[in-house]
């Protein structure tokens, strides 16, 4: 029996030791669970609270404890007893409640407790220093049992809070370091944008940038020789607000604006071709085709000199887009080649926005208004077509009507070769062709016909009846002249009389312009055709004679 009793006592003792060991489990999870919420509650008595000068110190705490015990001993002689309390230890700190009323007497947070001291003379007494700077207090407490478990719980609480705080700070530091790394990375990118090495445009100092159309895209890139790997590329995002658009490109010399056309000083200078758009000089003013497709349809021969389309020759599509379509205009600069584009360009069939002059009004609508020197045909000949100079007109040099009629018949027979829809082909233009004299006689006679009234069977779509060319009764009729149409030629005697009456007019035309084409004589206000002074169709045989000075004298 004794042995069984001893075994039972041993089991109970071991169970108590196990329970104590379980109470001594001070893992982090256990401590968190222990101090969570209200925490651990202990029964005690409040010895007293004393103000101290410092936040910590064993000597300081021991002196304060002895002082408070002396006060309690004096009160006990008077019959007063210590206040019974219970205190709780939690994450919120130390709370002291009145045992009788349960009211909260004192609350000291963990961060306010600066020092914990144990009484070496009494194992049930301990104290702690708390308060803020300049207001420190020492609280002395006497526990119902040993004060060591309370002190250990306070130590564990402070250690746990310290570790949790340290871990939180490490996490915050790690997150902050990560943010700092991102900020540093972003700062590096921003500094690279401000760095002149990584500018979009890099120019050498003191040199103007060379704009090459083929390598223009390569200019606006970061130089590959100074480009770092991947990370330091110029970002595609918007620049920083502190960096303006000009600061982004650095000190850049702005190239001159070569695309804007210069402002014309005078109306005459507006149509002078620039160095990049100079038209090739050609003696063949009207080009390979007598008239541009967009200006005058095929088969039409207008009265007077037909103005070619201003943009008949289109060397480049870009030139037409920049300058825009203009109505037919001819400019003659002093001492320069007449500016007119009669040649068909790369795109002769392009529809022009401005309608041509020949199709807007009847051919004779403005004939009576051309009273003084219209000179449209002479403007297109210029100094580059030096034909035979017409001498002064006089009665001795003018041929008689009898010699003029055979020439008219021969010219009419020559003109019959051109009754077709398109004019005859012209030899290819060469730079050494000085004038129309290099072409065939038939081709020259075809152009001499421009501005002269035609027969109705000449594929002319104009209404001949609208031309105010009334035949004048001849004062000296000739019996040998064949019957000629009235619109083609008036009476030779009337023309001779008109020349004889006003010889100064011909001299002005001959001295001022020296042009082989005198189409203004066909556009006189009275409608008479002063073409009896020479052959209007030229010499068929191609040999000059005294009577036929110029192949275009009458046209």
From Swiss-Prot:
A GO molecular function assigned to this protein is: signaling adaptor activity
The region called Disordered is annotated at: 1-26, 384-410, 418-437, 468-555
Concerning SUPFAM superfamilies, the annotation shows: PH domain-like
- Please note every region of biased composition (Acidic residues): 504-513
> Which intervals carry biased composition (Basic and acidic residues)?
15-26
Instruction: Provide ranges: composition bias, Low complexity.
Output: 470-479, 487-501
Residue ranges of every copy of the PID domain listed in the record: 36-189
May I have one GO cellular component term? cytoplasm
Name a Pfam family for this protein. DAB2_SBM
Q: Which GO terms describe its biological process?
A: neuron migration
The chain residues annotated with the modification Phosphotyrosine are 198, 220, 232
Which InterPro entries does this one have? Answer: DAB1/2_SBM, Dab_PTB, PH-like_dom_sf, PTB/PI_dom
Compartments annotated for it: namely: Cytoplasm
Q: Which PROSITE patterns match?
A: PID
Q: Indicate yes or no for the key word Cytoplasm.
A: yes
Q: Identify the SMART domains for this entry.
A: PTB
Primary residence: cytoplasm
Sorted UniProt keywords: Cytoplasm, Developmental protein, Differentiation, Neurogenesis, Phosphoprotein, Ubl conjugation
Q: How is it modified after translation?
A: Phosphorylated by FYN on Tyr-198 and Tyr-220 upon reelin induction in embryonic neurons. Also phosphorylated on Ser-491 independently of reelin signaling.
What residues bear Phosphoserine in this entry? 491
Q: Where is the composition biased (Polar residues)?
A: 391-403
| Subunit-level organization | Associates with the SH2 domains of SRC, FYN and ABL. Interacts (phosphorylated on tyrosine residues) with CRK and CRKL (via respective SH2 domain). Interacts with DAB2IP, SIAH1, LRP8 and VLDLR. Interacts with LRP1. Interacts with APLP1 (via NPXY motif). Interacts with DAB2IP. Interacts with ZSWIM8.
Report the protein's function. Signaling adapter of the reelin-mediated signaling pathway, which regulates the migration and differentiation of postmitotic neurons during brain development. Mediates intracellular transduction of Reelin signaling following reelin (RELN)-binding to its receptor: acts by docking proteins through its phosphotyrosine residues and PID domain.
Q: What is known of its domains?
A: The PID domain specifically binds to the Asn-Pro-Xaa-Tyr(P) motif found in many tyrosine-phosphorylated proteins.
**Which named protein is this?**
Disabled homolog 1
User: Which species does the entry assign this protein to?
Assistant: Macaca fascicularis (Crab-eating macaque)
């Amino acid at each position: 029996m004794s042995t069984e009793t001893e075994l039972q006592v041993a089991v109970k003792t071991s169970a108590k030791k196990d329970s104590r060991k379980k109470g001594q489990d001070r893992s982090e999870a256990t401590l968190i669970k222990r101090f969570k919420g209200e925490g651990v509650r202990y029964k005690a008595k409040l010895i007293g609270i004393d103000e101290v000068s410092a936040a910590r110190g064993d000597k300081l705490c021991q002196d304060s404890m002895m002082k408070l015990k002396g006060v309690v001993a004096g009160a006990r002689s008077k019959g007063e007893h210590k206040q019974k309390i219970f205190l709780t230890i939690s994450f919120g700190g130390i709370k002291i409640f009145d045992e009788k009323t349960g009211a909260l007497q004192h609350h000291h947070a963990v961060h306010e407790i600066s020092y914990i001291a144990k009484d070496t003379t009494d194992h049930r007494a301990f104290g702690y220093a708390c308060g803020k700077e300049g207001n420190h207090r020492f609280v002395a407490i006497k526990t119902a049992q040993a004060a060591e478990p309370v002190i250990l719980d306070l130590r564990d609480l402070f250690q746990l809070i310290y570790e949790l705080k340290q871990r939180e700070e490490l996490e915050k530091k790690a997150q902050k370091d990560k943010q700092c790394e991102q900020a540093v990375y972003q700062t590096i990118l921003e500094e690279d944008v401000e760095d002149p090495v990584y500018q979009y445009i890099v120019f050498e100092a003191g040199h103007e940038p060379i704009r090459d159309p083929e390598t223009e895209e390569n200019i606006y890139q970061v130089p590959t020789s100074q480009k770092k790997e991947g990370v330091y590329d110029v970002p595609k995002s918007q620049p920083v607000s502190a960096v303006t658009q000009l600061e982004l490109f650095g000190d850049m010399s702005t190239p001159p604006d070569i695309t804007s056309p210069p402002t014309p000083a005078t109306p005459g200078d507006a149509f002078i071709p620039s160095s990049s758009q100079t038209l090739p000089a050609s003696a063949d003013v009207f080009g390979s085709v007598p008239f541009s497709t967009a200006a005058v349809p095929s088969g039409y021969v207008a009265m007077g000199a037909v103005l070619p389309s201003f943009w008949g020759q289109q060397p480049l599509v870009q030139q037409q887009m920049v300058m825009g379509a203009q109505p037919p205009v001819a400019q003659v600069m002093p001492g320069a080649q007449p500016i007119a584009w009669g040649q068909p360009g790369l795109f002769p069939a392009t529809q022009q926005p401005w309608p041509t002059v020949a199709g807007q009004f009847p051919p004779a609508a403005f004939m009576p208004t051309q009273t003084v020197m219209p000179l449209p045909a002479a403007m297109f000949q210029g100094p580059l077509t030096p034909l035979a100079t017409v001498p002064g007109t006089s009665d001795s040099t003018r041929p008689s009507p009898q010699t003029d009629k055979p020439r008219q018949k021969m010219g009419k027979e020559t003109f019959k070769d051109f009754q077709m829809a398109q004019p005859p082909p012209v030899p290819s233009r060469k730079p050494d062709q000085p004038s129309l004299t290099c072409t065939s006689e038939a081709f020259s006679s075809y152009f001499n016909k421009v501005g002269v009234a035609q027969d109705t069977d000449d594929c002319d779509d104009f209404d001949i009846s609208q031309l105010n060319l009334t035949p004048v009764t001849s004062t000296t009729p000739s019996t040998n002249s064949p019957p000629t149409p009235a619109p083609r030629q008036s009476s030779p005697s009337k023309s001779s009389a008109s020349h004889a009456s006003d010889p100064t007019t011909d001299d002005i035309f001959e001295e001022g312009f020296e042009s082989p084409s005198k189409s203004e004589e066909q556009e006189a206000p009275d409608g008479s055709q002063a073409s009896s002074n020479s052959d209007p169709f030229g010499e068929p045989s191609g040999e000059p004679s005294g009577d036929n000075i110029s192949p275009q004298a009458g046209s």
